[in-house]
A protein has these predicted regions:
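Short loop/turn segments that connect beta-strands within the blades of beta-propeller domains
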Residues: 75-76, 104-105, 111-113, 176, ...
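Beta-sheet repeat architectures centered on beta-propellers
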Residues: 2-70, 75-78, 83, 368-372, ...
Length: 592
């Protein structure tokens, strides 16, 4: 008798020993995870939960953080350095949040408050300053030397009857235009004085200003003798932009010419040092650079002087401004490879800084910074990373490129980012308003998803990355560093973590059976791990196994074979572990 011969069922054994992180796409490969929570690539090729964070400091109303040799932050309108509140005197920080904090030399700039703080000596003040001399107060205008000393002169008529001596000054008026001349005995000629100076005297007019400040002078119109000084008409007032050449509390010296000393008591006058309205700022080459929100103006301050933005004397240290003709608002700014860069959503403008003051701009059309994601700009290992409208981009000096294909079709907004070591940390929200913290390992090209932290601001300080949790109002450290001896300091306890595979089995048209799964895993004491399976995208997860203990071992998951087209697995746990490998044994069935 002959018996039929049965073919042995094909059995396949696949082992994954290198895990490629987060990949929220249908093309999620073996070793990648369609979803995850609180995982890290730090122990690649193994997959592991992230490190426990440090709870560094709690806040009342956090508004910003900055590294300036020590950690600085603003909490509830107060400035702190290393946890110590600073006395700002009459300077008041407003409640507007978040703040933009920038550093230039010893200075820390607080925007939009327009406050400067000297971290070396503790001095502080406002970048802007206005002094007003009201009607009824005496204002005197007189010709003077550059240092403010009195200058004596005579009209041209005087020298018809008197012989000039060396150094005599003469006021010459031709066709209503006055000019000052000085007599040179060696040549017996009257030489025109190239630059003349006027001293303006009034109680308190120069208080709070400094020599070299670029200011705007405004006075009530109607004084013809001042037409050579105040050249701009502004309704019922006239004004001029000039530089203070010398000052005391009660007088200032500016460039200008008068043909007689003049005293007024019926005019109001203001002296203003103004700072342009800027949406974003960055420091480069001992200058602070900024851009207007409307996307048409770029500015920089006077060399080494954050308070002066309107000094235009024609020298290399002048402040500077340029107009940008392209459409769209500015969305961010940063200094990269020695260039101030100003971003729009569809372009960036790079400024070539010149030592002579002849700065030049060049615009490149490409993926720019997404509106609301200006805090995503961060430099990591000489590469600039940021969130664009479509993706997270990397930029190394040529053109931006996407690094976030693994995030799939989910759209994210309002990104905030920081960097530490080889990792780029970014917190952003989806269209439903749910925030997620992602980490990009630039060395391995791997993304990991952590939790739902909403970050107000990141700040790298020495060997750790600090951030302000906007919901909990707490400063935390990524690496667990605890800087300050405060009651709330603590190391984060055990947290839940999760990894979920993509659909497995799409590469074969036949139905299949999951016969066995083996996990090679290192567990810390007190860690529990659960294993789940889902068949044919049914939406229900079947619990298969629980793992606990200590040390490294292989767990064999007991599975009753179930026929399916494809399947997914999920691992959840609480506590520390390292997943070294996952081995799947499957048996093929028919395609019916």
């Amino acid at each position: 008798m002959q018996f039929p011969i049965f073919q042995e069922v094909a059995r396949y054994r696949e082992m994954t020993a290198a895990f490629g992180g987060y990949n929220h796409q249908l093309s999620c490969q073996e070793g990648q995870f369609f979803d995850m929570k609180n995982m890290t690539s730090e122990y690649f090729p193994a997959m592991s939960p992230r490190k426990n964070r440090g709870i560094v400091k709690s806040f009342v109303n956090p508004q910003g953080i900055l590294d300036k040799e020590n950690l600085m932050w603003i909490d509830d309108n107060e400035l702190y350095i290393n946890g110590v509140k600073q006395d700002l005197g009459d300077v008041t920080i407003t409640s507007e949040s978040p703040k933009t904090l920038a550093k230039m030399g010893a200075y820390v700039i607080i925007m939009p408050d327009r406050i400067w703080y000297n971290a070396d000596n503790g001095e502080c003040g406002y970048m802007e300053k206005t002094n007003t001399i009201p009607k009824g107060e005496r204002i005197t205008f007189s010709l003077c030397e550059a240092n403010g000393s009195t200058l004596s002169w005579h009209e041209a008529e005087y020298y018809k009857d008197h012989d000039p001596v060396d150094g005599d000054y003469m006021m010459s008026t031709v066709n209503g235009k006055s000019s000052l001349k000085v007599y040179a005995a060696s040549t017996k000629l009257w030489m025109t004085v190239a630059t003349t100076y006027t001293q303006i005297t009034a109680v308190g007019i120069g208080k709070g200003f400094e020599k070299g400040d670029g200011v705007k002078l405004t006075i009530d119109s109607g004084v013809s003798e001042l037409s050579n000084i105040f050249v701009n008409e502004e309704g019922d007032k006239v004004s001029t932009n000039t530089t203070i050449m010398d000052r005391t509390d009660d007088c200032i010296t500016v460039v200008g010419i008068l043909n007689k000393t003049l005293t007024l008591t019926d005019k109001e006058m203001t002296v203003e040092r103004k700072v342009p309205d800027m949406a974003f700022i960055t420091e480069c080459n001992n200058r602070l650079w900024g851009c207007s929100e409307d996307g048409h103006e770029i500015y920089c301050c006077k060399l080494g002087d954050v308070k002066n933005w309107n000094c235009f004397a024609g020298i290399a240290t002048d402040s500077w401004a340029a107009t940008v003709g392209s459409d769209g608002k500015f969305t961010g700014a940063i200094t990269y490879l020695g260039y101030p860069m100003f971003f729009k959503e569809d372009s960036f403008i790079k400024v070539s800084v010149s030592a002579t003051g002849g700065h030049q701009t060049k615009e490149t059309k490409c993926r720019g910074v997404q509106k609301g994601s200006h805090r995503s700009l961060s430099i990591l290992n000489e590469t600039l990373y940021y969130k664009s409208s479509a993706c997270v981009c990397g930029y190394n000096g040529s053109l931006p490129y996407s690094i976030s294909d693994e995030m799939g079709d989910v759209k994210y907004y309002d990104a905030v980012a920081g960097s530490l070591g080889d990792r780029y940390y970014i917190s952003m929200r989806d269209a439903k308003g749910v925030y997620s913290m992602f980490v990009y390992d630039s060395k391995k090209g791997i993304w990991c998803k952590e939790d739902n932290t909403k970050v107000l601001s990141f700040c790298k300080h020495y060997d750790d990355l600090y951030y302000i949790d906007a919901d909990e109002k707490v400063m935390k450290s990524v690496g667990g560093t605890l800087l300050y001896d405060v009651p709330e300091k603590a190391t984060e306890g055990k947290f839940n973590w999760l990894v979920e595979s993509g659909a497995i089995g799409y590469s074969s048209p036949e139905h299949k059976y999951v016969a066995r799964i083996n996990l090679r895993i290192t567990l810390e004491l007190g860690t529990d791990v659960d294993f789940y399976l889902q068949y044919d995208s049914c939406g229900e997860w079947e619990h298969k196994f629980n793992m606990s203990g200590k040390g490294t071992r292989t767990f064999s998951v007991p599975i009753i074979p179930k026929r399916c087209d494809h399947f997914k697995y999920r691992l959840t746990g609480k506590g520390g572990c390292k997943i070294h490998s996952i081995t799947k044994t499957t048996e093929e069935g028919s395609d019916i």
